[in-house]
Amino acid sequence: MKIFNKQPFLIAEIGVNFYDIAEKEGISDMDAAKLMIDEAKACGVDAVKFQSYKAETIASQNSSAYWDLSEEPTESQFEMFKKFDKFGKEEYRQLSEYCKQVGIMFLSTPFDFDSADYLDEFMDIYKISSSDLTNIPFIKYIASKNKPSLLSTGAATMREIKDAVKAIEDTSLVKLR
């Protein structure tokens, strides 16, 4: 399966930034996400990438903020993530379909098993966050879907990277290149 049809293959990181655009512009979250897709396409980007999660799966309700509170007043990690987890399967289906209409690849990094499952029908490739690079059970779960995976390796050691790659190679039918 050939995924990347050119080099360099450019991926625009939308993440959850569309929520801020929606608030600033006074438009719906979906319209803001589509606006960012349109802007990425106009810039010549090959793919757009979102982030899919539920706050309950990635942060303790008691975890305190680690960011500058003068910039973002939310005082807990859980509440911060909760602000940006409004989209689910149906919304990502709509974004995937919209990406097909405009001719850009849709990606979303799953941060939990449920997200990995519902995103499977919308994506040809998975993106694994650097925050999950040492989460070998999750990496194996994604690899078991037998689709190519992109691994983010920010702040990782060579050992952690090798372990993650081995987990994919041991589980997936898709060969890494």
Regions of interest found by a model, annotated:
Residues P8, G88-Y92, S115, I128-I168:
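Active-site-adjacent beta->alpha loops and helix N-cap segments on the catalytic face
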Residues F18, D46-K86:
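Glycine-rich, proline-tolerant flexible connector loops at the mouths of alpha/beta enzymes
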Residues A32-Y53, F122:
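Catalytic domains of carbohydrate-active enzymes, especially glycoside hydrolases
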Residues E13, A40, L119, S152:
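Conserved, mostly hydrophobic/aromatic
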Residues S70-I136:
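Active-site beta->alpha loop and helix N-cap motifs at the rims of alpha/beta catalytic domains
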Residues L10-I14, V48-F50, F106-T109, Y126-I128, ...:
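Hydrophobic faces of well-ordered beta-strands that scaffold small-molecule active sites
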Residues E25-A40, P110-A116:
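Short, acidic/polar
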Residues M1-G15:
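N-terminal amphipathic alpha-helix/helix-capping segment at the start of soluble metabolic enzymes
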